[in-house]
């Protein structure tokens, strides 16, 4: 399994708007693409100094599945224009990790 991790940042004022956009449009759109090997996405949020940090963690069966999502240059970020207008800054590249151990205790959350 592959984990794709990406960071984006908003002002405090835009944080709720961005989270709503992710939940109601962007994540739904990703799911509706029916990407073979796509397993899901998590959203993390925290306040850091003068901004709000968001981290997305996506789960895929393989790098081929990641490439189906992000394209040949799969390390490049995938940030829709609507999100770019809300974000104050974001990582241009995503990080990819091979998942070596998975603890399913999170299923009880």
For the regions a language model picked out, list residue spans one by one.
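Exposed boundary/loop context
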Residues: 1, 30-33, 44
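An amphipathic, aromatic/His-enriched active-site/gating alpha helix that lines ligand/cofactor pockets
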Residues: 24-37, 59-96
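Short, surface-exposed ligand-recognition loops at beta-strand->loop->(often short) alpha-helix junctions
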Residues: 9-22
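Non-catalytic surface loops within mature trypsin-like serine protease
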Residues: 12, 60-62, 98-103
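Short acidic, gly/pro-rich beta-turn/loop elements at beta-sheet edges
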Residues: 16-18, 51, 66-68, 104-106
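Short, well-ordered beta-strand segments in beta-rich or mixed alpha/beta enzyme
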Residues: 3-9, 42-74
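Glycine-rich beta-strand-turn "strand-cap" elements at beta-sheet edges
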Residues: 39-52, 78-109
């Amino acid at each position: 399994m592959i984990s794709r991790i990406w960071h984006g940042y908003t002002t405090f004022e835009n944080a709720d708007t961005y989270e709503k956009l992710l939940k109601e449009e962007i994540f739904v759109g990703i799911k509706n693409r029916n990407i073979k090997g796509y397993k899901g996405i998590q959203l993390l949020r925290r306040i850091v100094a003068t901004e709000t940090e968001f981290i997305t963690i996506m789960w895929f069966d393989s790098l081929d599945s990641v490439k189906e999502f992000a394209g040949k240059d799969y390390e490049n970020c995938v940030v829709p224009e609507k999100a770019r207008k809300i974000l104050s800054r974001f990582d241009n590249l995503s990080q990819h990790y091979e998942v070596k151990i998975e603890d399913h205790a999170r299923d009880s959350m």
